[in-house]
Amino acid sequence: MAMMHPPQPPQGSYHHPQTLEEVRTLWIGDLQYWVDENYLTSCFSQTGELVSVKVIRNKITGQPEGYGFIEFISHAAAERTLQTYNGTQMPGTELTFRLNWASFGSGQKVDAGPDHSIFVGDLAPDVTDYLLQETFRVHYSSVRGAKVVTDPSTGRSKGYGFVKFAEESERNRAMAEMNGLYCSTRPMRISAATPKKNVGVQQQYVTKAVYPVTVPSAVAAPVQAYVAPPESDVTCTTISVANLDQNVTEEELKKAFSQLGEVIYVKIPATKGYGYVQFKTRPSAEEAVQRMQGQVIGQQAVRISWSKNPGQDGWVTQADPNQWNGYYGYGQGYDAYAYGATQDPSVYAYGGYGYPQYPQQGEGTQDISNSAAGGVAGAEQELYDPLATPDVDKLNAAYLSVHASAILGRPMWQRTSSLTSQLGK
């Protein structure tokens, strides 16, 4: 099969927009290292309105920087693509497209006036940028965009995001009117998001959101806030196989990788197009990453990258809502109060997608209130890492310390009697 080359505009025909309405180029971010111009061209050429594709690479290493630009024949064509593709699944992967209006050619976000943003928490796992945006835009015409923050290694939602408004008055109305209303299957928790500083380059990211959780000292324990990425974690033996032939079975996938070492687990999710392979040893997984990259399995050349081991958060084998409840540390059938503390939205930080970076509470001289602990004596702060596996017993104990008086009988998710003894009951 002949190599596909991305379309290129005629020399000297580059379009230099003077206003936002003239912009016809989209920024695309959160790209995996294997994504190149050919792949993006295959994704967007079906629009029939594509002019050029460019993936930005490091000038020294030549490696992709994780973002690029896609030019269309007109502003209207670019806008249609933005509305159609943003937040949808990228072919052959479990990731979603992250699109926004591009700059005037330097990687800077388009300056379209004042930026008034809100924080939106407790989002359901199926909420995309587009769904979040439209939830607000049907009520407020000045909505400029929305961003659901995702785990960069899995592409899955972290359960919160931001919505931008051009008008401060509409931002304030939305905070009052939309708080507690449903987006998808969950009520939203809304508050203002104050920019820490202007982030001009859209490819800047803050990949870890750290925020305080107040828990009783009786069940509090030191938490290591840093979680090594899979490629740096010597205990990780799992790889992700993208662009997988839809007809390949789990048994065939296991057979293809067993030549490199003992395979102890294989999973192809119901949506297919990708899969996971877990080896018994780390060296076998490393060899698979090196040797199987670009190899043909079935009828397609696969793309290999590191993944998290089964059982680690962010690694979900199927779209089971109960698994998502566990991922966020919620007791099955219970809401966000299972954390035992109200998360302060201002502590989230996110710098990608052209959104400003927001301050984390605790910076400078700010104090963190313990009021969310319900006045529990000895309550203390603990950094919560959304990438770490949650301690469900601890979270449930914190919940009981505040809400036990309102619960009849013993909660089904309270697995042992140790929680009662820990709380001195």
UniProtKB/Swiss-Prot annotation:
Keywords associated with the record: mRNA processing, Nucleus, Repeat, RNA-binding
Compartments reported by the entry: Nucleus; Cytoplasmic granule
Domain RRM: 24-102, 116-195, 237-309
One function term, GO molecular function aspect: poly(A) binding
Cellular-component GO terms for this entry: cytoplasmic stress granule; nucleus; U1 snRNP
Highest taxon of the lineage: Eukaryota
Pfam families the record matches: RRM_1
Subunit structure: Interacts with the poly(A) tail of mRNA in nucleus.
Function: Heterogeneous nuclear ribonucleoprotein (hnRNP)-protein binding the poly(A) tail of mRNA and probably involved in some steps of pre-mRNA maturation.
Protein name as annotated: Polyadenylate-binding protein RBP47B'
Naturally occurring in which organism (per UniProt): Arabidopsis thaliana (Mouse-ear cress)
Lineage start: Eukaryota, Viridiplantae, Streptophyta, Embryophyta, Tracheophyta
